[in-house]
């Protein structure tokens, strides 16, 4: 059974261009909570997506939808998923673990902007790009309606930022 850390290290090892977002990013930034899905914003270029697909396959993650994972490479099909099905993520799931990988199909912050402000967090020698606390707050505050876990994340992120400002 693989863990979220193994998935992060595998994405790094395959030289995928990604930024960790969502609940895992909150945890890596200091928020205490449980989560089983890894939300990542990736560069939607064929070579990078192919690396992501290889990483998922290597960890025996399969698409949640009954379609070949290679469909993720088709920009027109991704757009159709967003328009016709209001799809926000493309999910890879495990048959032997509750963990999953969510590839964000749409995000209010561009990859380049997110990456520029990302914090590089060292996980077993792998420098993992993690969405900044400020960007996480921006996204969490934009969720309508906010879920209970989003409200808690907002409170904790604001407290962490206030603590950082006090300690300089």
Region annotations inferred by a language model:
Residues 1-168:
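Compositionally biased terminal segments of proteins
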């Amino acid at each position: 059974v693989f863990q979220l850390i193994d998935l992060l290290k595998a994405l790094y090892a395959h030289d995928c261009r990604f930024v960790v977002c969502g609940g895992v990013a909150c945890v890596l930034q200091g928020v205490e909570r449980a989560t089983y899905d890894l939300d990542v914003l990736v560069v939607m270029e064929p070579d990078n997506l192919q690396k992501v697909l290889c990483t998922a396959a290597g960890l025996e993650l399969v698409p949640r939808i009954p379609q070949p994972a290679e469909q993720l490479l088709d920009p027109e099909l991704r757009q159709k998923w967003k328009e016709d099905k209001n799809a926000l993520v493309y999910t890879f799931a495990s048959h032997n673990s509750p963990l999953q990988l969510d590839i964000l199909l749409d995000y209010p912050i561009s990859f380049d902007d997110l990456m520029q402000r990302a914090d590089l967090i060292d996980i077993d020698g792998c420098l993992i790009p993690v969405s900044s606390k400020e960007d996480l707050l921006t996204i969490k505050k934009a969720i309508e309606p906010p879920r209970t876990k989003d409200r808690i994340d907002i409170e904790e992120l604001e407290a962490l930022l206030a603590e950082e400002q006090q300690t300089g």
